[in-house]
Amino acid sequence: MKLRYKILNGAIALTLVTISTLAVTLAYTKNCESPVIREINNPMKAIIYRCYGGPEVLEQAVIEIPEPLAHQILVRVKAAAVNPVDWHYMRGSPYIMRLMTGIGVPNDQGIGTDFAGIVEKVGSDVTKFKIGDAVFGGGGGPFAEYVLANASKS
């Protein structure tokens, strides 16, 4: 067998092993853990998910109202739409979605994508929006009373 065919076969075998390992890693789903009880100074209600699965993994929780960073705005959510992407995030499928949301468990517990609301706070670098502005946007887990959004994307 020629050397180039041996190298090609080795490269194909390595590629298959890599793809198989990635598939097994992405398919891993960690069990849901109980929430950690801690003191909350600025509470808000939110729908969250701590693990991948069906609607049974969604729970109403009381969490901290987030503080906007310099480039963010805090929006009081007036409406949040259910988007097909939310279903994929919640289930973690197709497994390639887990590269964005977290392998084993979600990195961000907030769920939801589309929202509309009123600006409550603005970060120090934000000049495009002011408190009281009506805005809409996507991302960040808006199935909650408040959501953070990047000012440049809203």
State where each predicted segment sits.
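A structural motif shared across PLP-dependent enzymes of the aminotransferase-like
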Residues: 139-151
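N-terminal signal-anchor transmembrane helix
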Residues: 30-44, 62-68
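Cytochrome P450 core scaffold surrounding the K-helix E-X-X-R motif
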Residues: 85-91
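Extended, non-globular alpha-helical segments
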Residues: 78-79, 152-154
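Short N-terminal binding/cap micro-motifs at the start of the first secondary-structure element
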Residues: 54-58, 84
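Glycine-rich beta-strand-centered segment in the early N-terminal region that forms part
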Residues: 65-81, 94-141
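Terminal signal-anchor or tail-anchor transmembrane helices
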Residues: 3-33
